[in-house]
Amino acid sequence: MEKFAKNYVEKFMDELVAKNPGEKEFHQAVREVVESVADYVVEYPHLMDQKILERMVEPERVVMFRVPWTDDRGEIHINRGFRVQMNSAIGPYKGGIRFHASVNLSIMKFLAFEQTFKNALTTLPMGGAKGGSDFSPRGKSDAEVMRFGQSFMTELQRHIGPDTDVPAGDIGVGGREVGYLFGQYKRIRDEFTGTLTGKGLGWGGSRLRPEATGYGVCYFAQEMLATRRETFEGKTVLVSGSGNVAQYAAQKAMRLGAKVVTLSDSDGFVYDAEGLTEDKMQYVFELKNVRRGRIREYAEKYPEAVYYPGERPWKIACDIALPCATQNEIGEDDAEALVKGGCFCVVEGANMPTRPEAIAVFQKSRLLYSPGKASNAGGVATSGLEMSQNSIRNQWTAEQVDNELHRIMSDIHKACLKYGTEPDGYINYVKGANIAGFIKVANAMIDQGLV
């Protein structure tokens, strides 16, 4: 059986790569899932007969479009927009919109594929999608971001809706951008519906939505730590990134008793051996969310911190690492440095931040390691809760949302334990998350026929 499964994986991947040449991020995401579920698939021949995996890796729809806009000098720019609607077997498409220079079709497909499994893990009725553009808001004025967002939504609005596809924010798309996108959708469609999530509290948003992904990472980490009778109390924590996910993961870890000593951005990282405090976190919120400055300014504000330009934080000794920046930020050397530095728990806040060879290092060392599709699902879970609140024209209290977020992250952890516990007791969270998500989506696809 094992040899057959291995041959099945290689044949499957050869065909996928031939059909999708040059899409290395998409290949990487698919291989991780296929390797995890191959034994399960070959054990149940009807899954092979129905070609479930072959159907899962083929998007139901890909929309690619031009986005023309003018800058403040009147100069015309053309960017490229995407929406990959991967799978709607268990609900309307759901997934973020990313505005970043690195955006391309491969990254959109990888993110939409990951989103399908992540959304299935939440147990909420949401399919998988992802969208975005190679436009970067960095260095742009509010007016330029607004004009771009309005142009982007002028095309995207044809393909989305509260029961069809519900986008949200992602890298480069925060509350400001969601506001501009929602305003243009409402203007064109003449309707006020829950078509986007991550909205402002005064116009259909959910309490705790900004905090949800970062908080959810820590709630999931608590469940992982409990399997080894550990907690955050007194632990040294590395956080990469300084955007939404990193900010709230750092804040929650700190409030759970950990000492958070790093934050980063694309230019480098800061190391504060004394650890973040509530006052320092408020400075980070103002720096990144209001002034949209660079993390090096933290070290200028707090002389006890050291700024490392052009580097990542993984060389710093720690107990727990929370990668919350971007895909493939932890390579093999970084993983070995983490292990050598005493790290025993890695919980992903970003999407696919760990390269396959680094995952192998973690699993060989028997670290607690969770993939983002499980541990960062709190964001989309709370987006799903926002959809529910919009449907009933109601707004829950922060306590209600937090309780639901806790429950969902705990349930995801239980699913990972069910399908990922190895014979020796080691918990393979990658395998557990992939099989749990796969089973739910596969069963729905079979029930709905060949569509």
Which residue ranges define each predicted feature?
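Structured beta-strand/loop patches that form or line metal/cofactor-binding pockets in enzymes
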Residues: 46-77
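Flexible, glycine/charged-enriched surface loops at secondary-structure junctions
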Residues: 24-27, 45-50, 123, 160-169, ...
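Glycine-rich phosphate/diphosphate-binding loop of Rossmann-like nucleotide-binding domains
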Residues: 197-200, 205-315
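General beta-strand structural signal in soluble alpha/beta enzymes
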Residues: 110, 164-168, 191-196, 239, ...
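Rossmann-like adenosine-cofactor binding region
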Residues: 268-369, 374
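Glycine/serine-rich phosphate-binding loop and adjoining beta1-alpha1 elements at the start
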Residues: 100, 119-233
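Adenosine-phosphate binding glycine-rich loop
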Residues: 2-29, 224, 339-451
